[in-house]
A protein has these predicted regions:
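Surface-exposed loop/turn motifs in large extracellular/passenger domains
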Residues: 1-404
Length: 404
């Protein structure tokens, strides 16, 4: 790692260009195909770096005591409220693994970097970096990573955890990211300070809880133009985010009035046991200017929605426009063109439904199946709404204590 004071004096700036690694990396600390860790006071720019090829240059992350451990939290390295890396072993702390660099600081920039190798680490691992506190632009992961099982968490195609800025960086269409908790195509966990901006999102993401085509768990900002992903999870599964938290925002890119909406494209499929949506499995924050055209959103039971499976936040200016052989379906629960369930405090405003909704054994609504919140300025037209039991409604199947 470039962290020796004798080599890199405090405040120095370093640019490394066109570096390549073809060897396997094994370590118990910060693991990166190019650099393990960059000192916080060193300004580092990596340009056109690449790691490995399809069969070489694995980055294997281990477990060891953290030199920056937080004693108040049992020695676990705390990255963000709610994120602790001490889960695997109570006596040790997880470190970070990335195809290019284990952990980026605020002064680290990655430009046009590509990882062709694998990343083998169960916690806080990413195609380019385990944890990003800096800036990543035009990055790409070509290989696959992870395993769809408990214990694998905070895994992302670009960064396991993002506290910085990621722009136009995503896995290849053939890449797969697999894990248990907070698994995303770009970032597993996008913190409140994290910003992800994309023209196009691709890839395949498989998880258990909070699985998303861009971010598994989003507390920050995600803006995109086009999303074509295949996402599968057990609960809170979405084309963009598995769980969009109260502080999270999902919006179009660029964020200007004349821009087209963020579009979840026909090639997208979302499958979940509970809480599945074209944009978010569960929304507690803000989703606006999004259009769902996904080829398939299928939920075994509970909530299926064109935009969000369940909503307690705000969904503004969004549209479900998937019809014909494109499926929005729940086998035994509640299906809605915008949200399967609009909970207490949930707001659906200026939303449009022009697609199909099916609840095989439950309730189906053009906007939402169950409404406990508010629905204003909504429009339903040219739609096919089907249910085999209970209630069906053009706007909502059942208005519990909400306002329409």
């Amino acid at each position: 790692a470039l962290d020796e004071p004798a080599l890199n004096p405090s405040g120095s700036a370093i640019t490394l260009t066109s570096l390549s690694n073809q060897f396997n990396i094994y370590a118990n600390a910060y693991v990166g195909g190019i650099i393990g860790y960059n000192a916080a006071d060193t300004t580092l720019t990596l340009e056109n770096a690449s790691n490995g090829n399809q069969s070489q240059a694995q980055s294997y992350g281990g477990l060891a005591l953290s030199p920056r451990a937080d004693a108040a939290n049992g020695g676990a390295y705390i990255l963000d409220s709610g994120v602790s890396l001490g889960e695997l072993d109570p006596d040790h702390n997880g470190y970070f693994a990335g195809g290019i660099i284990g952990c980026t600081t605020a002064k680290t920039t990655l430009n046009h970097c590509t990882n062709y190798g694998g990343v083998q680490h169960p916690v806080a691992a990413g195609g380019l970096t385990g944890v990003n506190n800096g800036t990543i632009t035009d990055g790409r992961m070509v290989n696959s990573m992870g395993s769809q099982q408990e214990g694998y968490r905070y895994l992302g195609g670009i960064a396991g955890i993002n506290n910085g800025t990621i722009t136009n960086s995503a896995p290849a269409e053939s890449s797969s990211i697999r894990g248990g908790l907070d698994i995303g195509g770009v970032a597993g966990y996008n913190s409140k300070s994290g910003v992800i901006t994309l023209e196009n999102a691709n890839g395949n993401v498989y998880g258990i809880t909070a699985t998303g085509g861009v971010a598994g768990y989003n507390l920050g900002t995600v803006t995109a133009r086009s999303v074509t992903v295949k996402v599968s999870g057990t609960t809170q599964t979405g084309g963009v985010a598995g769980l969009n938290a109260a502080s999270g925002t999902i919006d179009q890119e660029p964020r200007t009035p004349s821009s087209i909406s963020i579009t979840v494209q026909n090639g997208t499929t979302v499958s979940s046991t509970t809480q599945g949506g074209g944009v978010a499995g569960r929304n507690e924050g803000l989703i606006q200017n999004a259009t769902n055209r996904a080829g398939s959103i299928q939920v075994v039971n509970q909530y299926a929605g064109g935009i969000a499976g369940s909503n307690s936040g705000r969904i503004y200016g969004c549209m479900h426009a998937a019809s014909g052989n494109r499926v929005l379906y729940t086998g035994g629960g509640f299906a809605g063109g915008i949200a399967g369930c609009n909970e207490v405090g949930g707001e659906l405003k200026i939303v449009t439904m022009n697609g199909s909704v099916t609840a095989a054994n439950g309730e189906a609504g053009g906007v939402t199946a169950h409404n406990y919140g508010s629905i204003t300025m909504s429009r339903v037209y040219g739609s096919d709404i089907r249910g085999t039991s209970d209630a069906i409604g053009g706007i909502t199947a059942c208005n519990e204590a909400g306002a329409v």
